[in-house]
Each structure stands twice: as C-alpha cells, then as structure tokens.
C-alpha cells in the first residue's frame, strides 16, 4: 500500500482537540499549542498575510460588552455617579 488514497482510510487518531481560549478544534494534543489563536502564549496569534482571518477575529466581531459604551462615556467626559451640585 502506498501513501495515497488507500492509506488515508487508516487514519483515525485526532491530532487536534478543542482549544480553551478560542473554542476551535485547533489545539494540537502533542505540541500543546493552538494553531488558530496560539494558546497558551499570552498574545493572540495574528499574521499580516492572513488579512481575512484578522477580519474574522478582530475587535468588533464579538459582543464588546465594555468597549461599545466607551465612546458615549468619552463624549460626556467620563462622568462619575455623583451629580453636580447646582449653585442657586
């Protein structure tokens, strides 16, 4: 048997499993690194030659729980909870 089509039927071991950070099935079991996000390294994996991949994972593609309110708060000067005392 050669290395072509017939031998592909014998492959049944998983080399990648689910990643704890990005959730994709890209975490290499033996290398212990994610091919998608680069986990466990502190910085998320990103390359300039993968422009489409950057577009998919960049800021603004998720919920942005905190960041979506920052522009409005900036416009008002980051006011705190206490109201200003009115001079009468």
UniProtKB/Swiss-Prot annotation:
Coiled coil region boundaries: none
Family listed: Belongs to the eukaryotic ribosomal protein eL37 family.
Function, in words: Component of the ribosome, a large ribonucleoprotein complex responsible for the synthesis of proteins in the cell. The small ribosomal subunit (SSU) binds messenger RNAs (mRNAs) and translates the encoded message by selecting cognate aminoacyl-transfer RNA (tRNA) molecules. The large subunit (LSU) contains the ribosomal catalytic site termed the peptidyl transferase center (PTC), which catalyzes the formation of peptide bonds, thereby polymerizing the amino acids delivered by tRNAs into a polypeptide chain.
Pfam family, one: Ribosomal_L37e
Record-level GO cellular component terms: cytosol; cytosolic large ribosomal subunit; preribosome, large subunit precursor
Domain of life: Eukaryota
One GO BP annotation of this record: cleavage in ITS2 between 5.8S rRNA and LSU-rRNA of tricistronic rRNA transcript (SSU-rRNA, 5.8S rRNA, LSU-rRNA)
Protein name: Large ribosomal subunit protein eL37B
């Amino acid at each position: 048997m050669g290395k072509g089509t017939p031998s592909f039927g014998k492959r049944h071991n998983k080399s990648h499993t689910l990643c704890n950070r990005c959730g994709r099935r890209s975490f290499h079991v033996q290398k212990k690194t994610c091919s998608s996000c680069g986990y466990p390294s502190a910085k998320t994996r990103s390359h300039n030659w993968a422009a489409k991949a950057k577009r998919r994972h960049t800021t603004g593609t998720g919920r942005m729980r905190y960041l979506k309110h920052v522009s409005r708060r900036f416009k008002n000067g980051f006011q705190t909870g206490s109201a200003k005392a009115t001079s009468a």
